[in-house]
Amino acid sequence: MITLSNSIHLYARPDTKERLLEFFTSMLGLEAVASADAVGSPEPMYSFTFANGASLSVEFTQDALSSQQAQRGAWLELRSDDAVGLQQKVQAFGLKRVVHPYTPFFYVQAPGGQVFRIVASKEK
């Protein structure tokens, strides 16, 4: 049997660091934990643990994709008990809406370029 883990690692450019950390902490209510795994890295990696146990880490490097390039990377999904409220909150935060030409879903681009779909916890 093969399964997909619930651990994600992203790359983002250093100039997006403060705003991206603010997105995860202020907008999503997560704690940013500096990782001890980044031995020799000029920038610390940060990890975030979600309510369902999923984890996401971010590494800041100049080699990360641009925001435009990141739109062609993996798109992630955030599930919320108040999806509409979170959608409004991230738009007020200034995140860019991303429109997929073939789906009706709500997508935003986080600082750093990653695209997130925001859905209700009960959606499939």
Regions found by a protein language model. Give the residues of each.
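A short alpha-helix capping/helix-coil boundary motif
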Residues: 1, 64-67, 88
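Conserved acetyl-CoA-binding loop of GNAT-fold acetyltransferases
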Residues: 25-33, 94-96
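Residues that flank catalytic or metal-binding motifs in active/ligand-binding sites
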Residues: 4, 44, 54, 72-74, ...
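Conserved short beta-strand elements that form part of the metal-binding/catalytic scaffold
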Residues: 31-70, 115-122
